[in-house]
């Protein structure tokens, strides 16, 4: 082999491999690895690709249901929505690159998740995102918000897919590690799904798409280590995206799939050519021989190490039917994309890489992929926090001033400044735009619609990982239900700190147990996902943030509900039990200055029972508007319904049994607001009593103000001005 760097303990450590892992490599291959082999092991055995700290716990997630076609383990999950149609979806993180280079980090995050979806044979129809930024007063936050939002919009808008929903939060725990979680949803024929497992010996392995450069080398390894003060120096490991090349790649891939050319397909994402080739071979129980002399490159003098670890974007690897090779090549040439046979499948179960006539790597393929190291790391449960009793919390201001303050806080204010930079209506199928409970996207050429949402409440997960995990799933389920959707499945993006710290691993394990329990109780299986660990800087971890992306089905998209009040004189009903739970509420944090206490418990049986009733009301046309209750509680939800319509409401006073500020701002779970015509109110209330569903009339729509009996009132227009002003003002340079 060629002269390569000497393998030293320092070089091994620089590749993110622990001494015991390197010893395992020596035992596995019976010799010292080459430099290229060391890079391959580093890429395949890092946390980002191998899931070595999380795999043992992920096995407990419920992943099956009659409508699940493909669960975790492929590029994306697939569910059956009837009529021969399937929805393909996944969520993935691009956290570390987005902190270092926010625009490019965000663009390539979107590009990567779109490829995961169309690799399965689906045409992307929607994107969503979940963004977590540091405290507004942190000197980098404005720059990061601006770059990430521009990157998401720049890629999605140019590629031609609508960005229809998401979630954005600010907290000081994300100062040194922001989170950029991107979700993509696509539509495919249920009987034409494409998979990654190669089959057949001596089948051509074809490189497709853009040329390989030096960008992104060790991007996956960077995503498997915590940051320190030198993180800015990692800028060269951030990939550069080209949405127009990705659009060409999409069309070319779908065309050769339709021409029945493809045996297996894998996008080149994390760890690039290494990961895609290893996964295809390992999943198919085959070996892979690659000749790097055939790889299209855009830079001269690239080494085998660089080509194997490059994360240049807009690239695919396929195993083609030999008799279809010329037809496939003609299709890709037509789209102006590179097409090169770079290797063949073999029966050897070995991964062999050649360059310039030399063998640069010769490794057992299964041990690189399926049989990477697996850890059951020590973990300790988070200590239980005390329940905060509402009567012990002094209200620092009256109810209406507190509402005005809350809707102008970073977490609860309008995110219009963000979503107006995204094209959310391209393709012409967006039924409900951002700003409601869930986006609704029409399934083209039919009456069906998809309800899409992304949810998590990190402060709950920090306070009680188990309840926080349950709540993240329950809120996604509620948001889909609140637009009239039938929740079908989720994708998760599990963002946590350093798993080598037992308390962080305890958060991960606790959240995962909560997610599993909620998914089982709500019949809401996990079909895809991503784990992002080491989200720490100088030992300070992010809040545990298990983002949940939910997908639901509407049989008739024209019957979806929205949050806006529809007309004056309708009854406002509060469905679900209200106790006035203030622990970990936004009110307690942002009005009272206390970030403490146990979060609200999640009663999954109540979630199911109450949600099914609300969905039935929407389908029957009884509910004219619907909104789930979450951050900010009852009065914030009422304000959102009023601001969405311009119609006010006359509200009854808080019941004597609940402290007023806890009634209006508590965050009890399993609750919805619905409006019904006055003529239906009595019948609905009686029906709810008969079904053992808590339901109370709390007011009537009408006027131009929110008016609470015995309290002050506030004009809806005044609320809207405050609601819409904070984020544009902040991004324009106003003090945080």
Swiss-Prot record:
The name this protein goes by in its record: Phosphoribosylformylglycinamidine synthase subunit PurL
Catalytic activity, reaction form: N(2)-formyl-N(1)-(5-phospho-beta-D-ribosyl)glycinamide + L-glutamine + ATP + H2O = 2-formamido-N(1)-(5-O-phospho-beta-D-ribosyl)acetamidine + L-glutamate + ADP + phosphate + H(+)
Assembly mode: Monomer. Part of the FGAM synthase complex composed of 1 PurL, 1 PurQ and 2 PurS subunits.
Listed GO biological process terms: 'de novo' IMP biosynthetic process
Family: Belongs to the FGAMS family.
Binding-site positions, ATP: 51, 90, 492, 529
Record carries keyword Nucleotide-binding: yes
Molecular function GO terms recorded: ATP binding; magnesium ion binding; phosphoribosylformylglycinamidine synthase activity
EC number: 6.3.5.3
Binding positions for substrate per the UniProt entry: 93-96, 115, 239, 311-313, 532
Annotated NCBIfam families: FGAM_synth_II, PRK01213.1
Locations listed in the record: Cytoplasm
Function statement: Part of the phosphoribosylformylglycinamidine synthase complex involved in the purines biosynthetic pathway. Catalyzes the ATP-dependent conversion of formylglycinamide ribonucleotide (FGAR) and glutamine to yield formylglycinamidine ribonucleotide (FGAM) and glutamate. The FGAM synthase complex is composed of three subunits. PurQ produces an ammonia molecule by converting glutamine to glutamate. PurL transfers the ammonia molecule to FGAR to form FGAM in an ATP-dependent manner.
Keywords noted in UniProt: ATP-binding, Cytoplasm, Ligase, Magnesium, Metal-binding, Nucleotide-binding, Purine biosynthesis
Pfam short name (any one): FGAR-AT_linker
Organism: Bradyrhizobium sp. (strain ORS 278)
Record's keyword annotation contains Nucleotide-binding: yes
UniProt pathway: Purine metabolism; IMP biosynthesis via de novo pathway; 5-amino-1-(5-phospho-D-ribosyl)imidazole from N(2)-formyl-N(1)-(5-phospho-D-ribosyl)glycinamide: step 1/2
